[in-house]
């Protein structure tokens, strides 16, 4: 199984309940497509290096995942690009 790290930035003015629902939705996207979540945790609210979609800060969330194929990652990537609550995301394959 390959190991991946996903980092995504959520807009800072989102309500706590909506943020929890967003995280649960994207965690389920990964698990529904065959990935196993090792860890999913909120990192912290941080100042961005540059303005993204009129925001100077963002809520960072990090997910460590194991997957046999990249279907779950492709679906996560596709849906996070069209979701307005996620400002940016990054998927990195970790060394075994």
Swiss-Prot record:
Please verify whether the record's keywords include Iron. no
Keywords attached to this Swiss-Prot or TrEMBL record, sorted alphabetically, are:
Ribonucleoprotein, Ribosomal protein, RNA-binding, rRNA-binding
Answer yes or no on keyword tRNA-binding: no
Name a single GO cellular component: ribosome
Identify the SUPFAM superfamilies for this entry. Ribosomal protein S6 (SSF54995)
Q: Which GO terms describe its molecular function?
A: small ribosomal subunit rRNA binding; structural constituent of ribosome
Q: Which Gene Ontology biological process is one annotated for this entry? A: translation
What InterPro entries does the entry give?
Ribosomal_bS6, Ribosomal_bS6_sf, Ribosomal_S6_plastid/chlpt, Transl_elong_EF1B/ribsomal_bS6
Pfam families the record matches: Ribosomal_S6
Biological role stated in the UniProt entry: Binds together with bS18 to 16S ribosomal RNA.
What the record says about family reads: Belongs to the bacterial ribosomal protein bS6 family.
Name of protein? Small ribosomal subunit protein bS6
